[in-house]
Amino acid sequence: MTDTSLQAALRAEHLSKVYDEGPARIQVLDDVSLTVARGEMVAIVGASGSGKSTLLHILGLLDVPTSGSLVVDGTATEGLSEARKSAVRNRSLGFVYQFHHLLPEFSALDNVAMPLIVRRMDRDQARLQAREVLGLVGLAAREGHYPGQLSGGERQRVALARALVTRPACVLADEPTGNLDRQTAQNMFELLSRVNRESGTAFAIVTHDPELAARADRQLHMANGRLLPG
């Protein structure tokens, strides 16, 4: 089902996630509601184990909540088959992680083009679109280099380009600067901010870094499975 009146990139309402481990009942998310508007950058901060990554996995349709509802780019996700979830994820979401997960045997250009090739786009057209996005992240001159020939910051920029190449409504980023030194991390966050402004893509970013989070449009704090204003 698609709600054409919904203008949010993501809308989650009353999400909970509970794990039953023998007699123990572990509540990881507790009545979490979150809306990410189109073009908005939202930062989610909190200690390890507070539920941030679990929330991001649910928002990314990589996990299911125990209760609650999620609408991604106008599509209600409750009850969708795995194939349909995959289609929504591939159409509307991009992902950036702390580790870049680039394929070492492919060039930067082909790593970025891969999501389009998987969609059966013509290879030349996929490379053309990938080349445009590499230019957006400042790596046009490095398109022929392999991951092992790139710096840590460059590899993360390639990963960002790969997340953007399908033109998603929202990019979900889990500690995207966590594996970078301070200066490179600041450069990466400035790039995220610029791409957010120029492309209109929404971002939901999980980070431990309050200084970086403060640059987002809105900052939220996760504690004990609950989401609070920053």
UniProtKB/Swiss-Prot annotation:
InterPro entries: AAA+_ATPase, ABC_transporter-like_ATP-bd, ABC_transporter-like_CS, ABC_transpr_LolD-like, MacB-like_ATP-bd, P-loop_NTPase. Its EC number is 7.6.2.-. Residues 10-228 form the ABC transporter domain. It is an enzyme of class 7 (translocase). SUPFAM superfamilies: P-loop containing nucleoside triphosphate hydrolases. It holds the Pfam family ABC_tran. ATP binds at G46, A47, S48, G49, S50, G51, K52, S53. Keywords: ATP-binding, Cell inner membrane, Cell membrane, Membrane, Nucleotide-binding, Translocase, Transport. It is found in: Cell inner membrane. One of its GO terms (cellular component) is plasma membrane. Belongs to the ABC transporter superfamily. Lipoprotein translocase (TC 3.A.1.125) family. The complex is composed of two ATP-binding proteins (LolD) and two transmembrane proteins (LolC and LolE). This is Lipoprotein-releasing system ATP-binding protein LolD. It comes from Bordetella avium (strain 197N). The gene is lolD.
